[in-house]
């Protein structure tokens, strides 16, 4: 199958998977909602249009919620490109956010420098955490999927211990840290909304990751190892080092996303569970077909649905967890290798017949000229 046909098939496959996911969601909406029409309006239209006018506040909320899942989507994109199914994005997001929060509370700095240092340290912490499953994979041949999945819960419980017993603000009714210093916060692009300058950083990160993956030797090596690890090894590529590199880059991006989200959206650190951005990043990367430059568009789609489900919960009484159902169905059909395999086979046969007919026609023309 040629590149054009392959792209056409993948687009068709993605569209059908999303359509099925929306259809499944519609079934649940008709079961749960007292007014299905109102619920559908909240899900599909109200995120951008409310009462016949552009819903600017909601649009800015969507853009703000894109920020962390762009980072986790990029992280998963790099790791999956190397065929490393690392699932520690959840833990690294939380760890990056927690460490950044501690620096934002206890280490005073100048206003312009403070958030930068917090974000960079959060990114480093994320990268260091990802070394654990990466080294276990390379040195011990351990499954990076299992190691990273367990790492998420180790990180969660360690953070909860320190949050509850060491850094908690006892004057508050819930478990949370002391407020961040004003100098440490990531500034809002539009005051009073969830949209921060972290969104701009996320777009810059997208461009840099795209350049790294498609315009550098290291990016090429990561993609080659993902396609065929054995061939890459026999070709002289440093497979072990690149496997570690891909996962560390994923950790850096996830940790950075967690730090930006915490310092931009909250006044204190109050996560008491894994935030969910790591799992959403997997869906985003799958939708983008591991193409870094497509990550923001996939993130926009998920953030839009997320906002729609939130509005549906507020105004139509449908559980906001509907977004989890949609993501799960999308993941299911994208992960199923045999999904639409017959359609792919028909496209291959059709393309082959067309090529043969074209060659026969060219041969007939050449024979006539002779």
Walk through the language-model features, giving the residues of each.
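Single transmembrane alpha-helix segments in multi-pass membrane proteins
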Residues: 28-34, 42, 47-106, 127-142, ...
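Cytosolic-side transmembrane-helix boundaries in multi-pass membrane proteins
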Residues: 1-20, 26-30, 227, 234-241, ...
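Transmembrane helix-bundle core of multi-pass membrane transporters
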Residues: 144, 148, 152-215, 322
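Hydrophobic alpha-helical segments embedded in the membrane of multi-pass proteins
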Residues: 19, 66-77, 92-98, 124-131, ...
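Transmembrane alpha-helical segments in multi-pass inner-membrane proteins
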Residues: 248-328
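Helix-loop-helix "hairpin" substructures at the membrane interface of multi-pass membrane proteins
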Residues: 191-268, 292-293, 297
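Short, non-helical or kinked segments that cap or interrupt transmembrane helices
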Residues: 34-38, 80-96, 138-147, 266-279, ...
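Short loop segments and helix-boundary regions at transmembrane helix junctions
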Residues: 2-12, 80-88, 110-173, 215, ...
